[in-house]
Swiss-Prot record:
Residues 35-292 form the CoA carboxyltransferase C-terminal domain. It is an enzyme of class 2 (transferase). One of its GO terms (molecular function) is ATP binding. PROSITE patterns: COA_CT_CTER. Acetyl-CoA carboxylase is a heterohexamer composed of biotin carboxyl carrier protein (AccB), biotin carboxylase (AccC) and two subunits each of ACCase subunit alpha (AccA) and ACCase subunit beta (AccD). It is found in: Cytoplasm. This is Acetyl-coenzyme A carboxylase carboxyl transferase subunit alpha. GO terms for cellular component: acetyl-CoA carboxylase complex. Its EC number is 2.1.3.15.
Length: 316
């Protein structure tokens, strides 16, 4: 298969040509319908050939695209009256994780997710979506609040991993993640986790314990990045593509292993091509699952969640 980024560039160039023709036709009052149709058909064919045959490494690159919708994008489309909360009440706030309350189709919910930036400046402010311990403690504070007020919890996962700087380690990064895993496993309210981009290691898992876990079609979820694995195994980060092929990190792989419950389709070209469509599909999925989960008694909800967690990684 051609290099993913080269193919993506060719598609962008063709899209640009189509837009130019449309604008030229409008401005000069000429009929270019035939030419535009030919290019549109060519574009659709290129997209099908590219996106219907993606290898794992290409999916890694697609999951990392800066253009993909973020947690705040989905909150804007799915949650009305959203109010963001800040701070962990121990140390400070962490902009790599956003969280708050709002209404999902009239249902009061708590929403929490990793937040990457839209450009370089925003990424620096958001620490490229890599949370510090205070981010995970903020998330847990909101989850405990959701439990108290019996609000379902929605989490959006999109991080390359928890931040591994000295300050983060000194403030208890590992402990913060571990406590989230423990507490999320026994929260007395429904939890639905959605991987929307990168699901990197414990940094992703700290928001990923749920009664239902789903992934977007071109998202990834793994215990380590392909670059990290290739560096450990072969002392060579340039072998990341080989590592990705081995890791079974795609949504399809994880669904087949019963690690996740559902794969949500993305439009041709990825979620960034039609974020409204993806949001609608997330809405449909979450509505149905919340309907089922809210009918369960608390004891049954926790028992099913425990069984789900314990069954991950079991081979028969």
């Amino acid at each position: 298969m051609h290099n993913f980024l080269e193919s993506e560039k060719a598609i962008h160039e063709l899209e640009g040509k189509i837009i130019e023709l449309i604008n030229f036709a409008d401005k000069n009052k000429v009929d270019l319908t035939y030419e535009i149709e030919i290019l549109s058909q060519k574009l659709e064919q290129m997209q099908k050939e590219m996106y219907e045959n993606l290898n794992p490494w290409s999916k890694v690159k697609l999951a990392r695209l800066q253009e993909r919708p973020t947690t705040l994008d989905y909150i804007e489309k799915l949650i009305s009256g959203f109010t963001e909360f800040h701070g962990d009440r121990f140390y400070g706030d962490d902009t790599a994780i956003v969280g708050g309350i709002g209404l999902f189709e009239g249902i009061p919910v708590t929403v929490i997710g990793h937040q990457k930036g839209k450009d370089t400046k925003d990424n620096i402010r958001r620490n490229f979506g890599m949370p510090h311990p205070e981010g995970y403690r903020k998330a847990l504070r909101l989850m405990k609040q959701a439990e108290k007020f019996k609000r379902p919890i929605l989490t959006f996962i999109d991080t390359s991993g928890a931040y591994c700087g000295i300050g983060a380690e000194e403030r208890g990064q590992g402990e913060a993640i571990a406590v989230n895993l423990i507490e999320m496993s026994k929260l007395k309210t429904p939890i639905i986790a959605i991987v929307i981009g990168e699901g990197g290691s414990g940094g992703a898992l700290a928001l990923g314990i749920g009664d239902r876990v789903c992934m977007l079609e071109h998202s990834i979820y793994s215990v380590i990045s392909p670059e990290g694995l290739s560096t450990i195994l072969w002392k060579d980060a340039t072998l990341a593509q080989r590592a990705a092929d081995m890791m079974q990190l795609t949504a399809q792989d994880l669904w087949s292993m019963k690690v996740i419950d559902q794969v949500i389709k993305e439009p041709l070209g990825g979620a960034h091509k039609n974020a409204d469509l993806v949001a609608d599909q997330i809405k449909t999925y979450v509505l149905q699952e919340l309907k089922d989960l809210r009918m369960l008694k608390t004891e049954e909800l926790l028992e099913k969640r425990y069984t789900k967690i314990r069954n991950i990684g079991i081979w028969k």
